[in-house]
Amino acid sequence: MQVFPPPQVPLLGAHTSTSGGLQNAIYEGQEIGASTVQMFTANQRQWRRRPLTDDLINSFKTALEETSLSYIMSHAGYLINPGAPNPEILEKSRICIQQEIQDCLSLGITFVNFHPGAAVNDTKEACLDRIVSSFSLVEPLFEDSPPLVVLFETTAGQGTLVGSTFEELGYLIDKLKHKIPVGVCIDTCHIFASGYDITSPGSWKQVLKNFDDAIGLSYLRAFHLNDSMFPLGKHKDRHAPLGEGDIGMESFKFLMTDELTRMIPKYLETPGGPDLWTKEIRQLKSFQK
């Protein structure tokens, strides 16, 4: 079981488009001034995946070589619910998890990011245990495999979603860390929506302490950078451009400059597309000068 070490330089990017081929997400990253990107490796709203061909894999790896982008993150599909109480949904989710991981290994991707799951009409405790079981099934894929880290993304706490507290994510990490390479991706909008105040350096330091106590900072492997259209603790997952929401730009300046967070890869998911991301990347980089 191999794990990529943390990067030696700050990495910043956005969720770019795979329209016309997976490699185009990499080239779009270069165009917006990114050093990394997040992408979908398959249609995020369908159960079925198109099989990877050798040509597609080679085109993707060529794009990585030509651009020098690294620590690429794949965002798994939205239909996947590893903790589903419905047996049919659970089985489909487990098949998709295996296929997603296999494709990421073939492509040489560093991170594969999953929404933890939803309890639906069951308890969160039972949901968490099913998530552990779902990801335990892929342990054989990581024997003698290229490095790949499974990330669980923080959620906004809406509905029956699990993963809105560090304690819930800590439970998953603790149960899985000796089986597969695992970590956490903090979405700034999501944790703000779930009640974690990150509007100032002081509040961020407290949140990072809480994370360390519940999970361990070594498992914080990535950030999704998003401002929030709604106030603290409203459990609304609505992204806003950086500095134009209720979180504020001071929060993102902290992440770019603090010793604990500056080297952790960061991926923009703000609404606005490539033109906005180019500006946001330029502004975020300016904080480190």
UniProtKB/Swiss-Prot annotation:
Domain of life of the organism encoding this protein: Bacteria
Signal peptide segment: none
Binding residues for Zn(2+) 3: H190, D237, H239
Cofactors named for this entry: Zn(2+)
Cofactor details (free text): Binds 3 Zn(2+) ions.
One annotated GO molecular function: deoxyribonuclease IV (phage-T4-induced) activity
Record-linked CDD domains: AP2Ec
A biological process from GO: base-excision repair
Pfam families, A to Z: AP_endonuc_2
Reactions that this protein is recorded to catalyse: Endonucleolytic cleavage to 5'-phosphooligonucleotide end-products
Record-listed Zn(2+) 2 binding positions: E153, D187, H224, E269
EC number(s) per entry: 3.1.21.2
Matches recorded under SUPFAM superfamilies: Xylose isomerase-like
Keyword list, A-Z: DNA damage, DNA repair, Endonuclease, Hydrolase, Metal-binding, Nuclease, Zinc
Binding site for Zn(2+) 1: H75, H115, E153
Function: Endonuclease IV plays a role in DNA repair. It cleaves phosphodiester bonds at apurinic or apyrimidinic (AP) sites, generating a 3'-hydroxyl group and a 5'-terminal sugar phosphate.
Record-stated family: Belongs to the AP endonuclease 2 family.
Protein name: Probable endonuclease 4
Organism annotation: Chlamydia abortus (strain DSM 27085 / S26/3) (Chlamydophila abortus)
Encoding gene (name): nfo
